[in-house]
Regions:
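Active-/binding-site microenvironments in catalytic and ligand-binding cores
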Residues: 2-273
Length: 273
């Protein structure tokens, strides 16, 4: 992105017609350059990249009390010669990171999460069949042990994700929030025992869910949050496409936000499979 001063300097050199012509033909000029680039090669042993991130838009459900993202154009190509938007959102919006400081005062903020914890072996624990029948189901410690019986011990430093299939409801806010007659939401999460096992016995880097919360949506106390974040680990909420990732063998890349003092923030999350 060119700074406004750079754009203005170009304007002074070129006539407006020339300037617009350069902009209009920019894509055509770039085609030969792209054609000369070498094809992207994945790290050895990986065959695909899966995007685990929802598109952040005003229509995406957000946790009650938070505001949907707002995007306001500040400048446009037609008017100023370059485009720029002002974006406003709560940190915990869309596919986003929960830093330890989100629940623990003085703990690590998102900008200070060690970078070697943002690249990790990905463990996917699937409870989609149970969740389809019981929205309040939890990932239990036994679910984790059963996973280990099939795939081996959860590696130290791994990122453990719950695949409940809840991301399939994201376009239907009523279904996604799943409120009962009293207004209580219902969606899966991690049990306290599972969270404790992961942070005290497996030393994971982080824990993720495809729902709005690490805890079950109906939880009155945030025990999973407190257990995970209280141990200095981070969480990622509102993941998607976990159905396309194998239970074991993939690697996750968490593009955590880095604004100073962040309690969390939208993230681009990828899986190498």
């Amino acid at each position: 992105m060119c700074a406004p001063s750079v754009v203005e300097s170009v304007r002074r050199t070129l006539s407006r017609r020339q300037f617009v012509g350069v902009v209009a033909t920019g894509a055509a000029v770039s085609v030969p350059v792209r054609a000369q680039q070498k094809p992207i090669r994945l790290p050895k042993g990986f065959r695909d990249v899966i995007d685990l991130t929802h598109v952040l838009s005003p229509l995406l459900p957000v946790y009650p009390g938070y505001r949907p993202i707002q995007v306001r154009p500040r400048s446009t190509v037609a008017r100023e010669g370059y485009a720029n938007n002002e974006v406003t959102f709560d940190e915990h919006t869309g596919t986003h990171v929960d830093a330890p400081v989100h629940f623990v005062s003085g703990a690590v903020s998102a900008d200070r999460v060690p970078v070697d914890r943002l690249l990790a072996p990905l463990v996917v624990v699937t409870i989609a069949e149970r969740a389809a029948k019981n929205a309040d189901t939890l990932v239990s410690a036994d679910d984790l042990l059963q996973w280990e019986k099939r795939y081996g011990r959860i590696p130290a430093g791994a990122f453990v994700a719950m695949h409940s299939g809840w991301d399939a409801h994201v376009r239907d806010a009523n279904r996604f929030f799943n409120r009962d007659a009293k207004g209580t939401m219902h969606a899966p999460g991690f049990s306290e025992a599972a969270a404790r096992l992961l942070v005290t016995e497996r030393d994971v880097s982080g824990v993720g869910v495809d729902t709005l919360s690490l805890d079950a949506a109906s939880a009155q106390k945030f025990v999973a949050h407190l257990t995970i974040l209280g141990a200095g680990k981070y969480g990622v909420e509102m993941l998607t496409n976990l159905s396309r990732v194998p239970p074991a063998g993939a690697t996750i890349i968490v593009g955590a936000p880095k604004h100073e003092g962040a309690t969390g923030g939208p993230a681009r999350v990828l899986a190498l499979v």
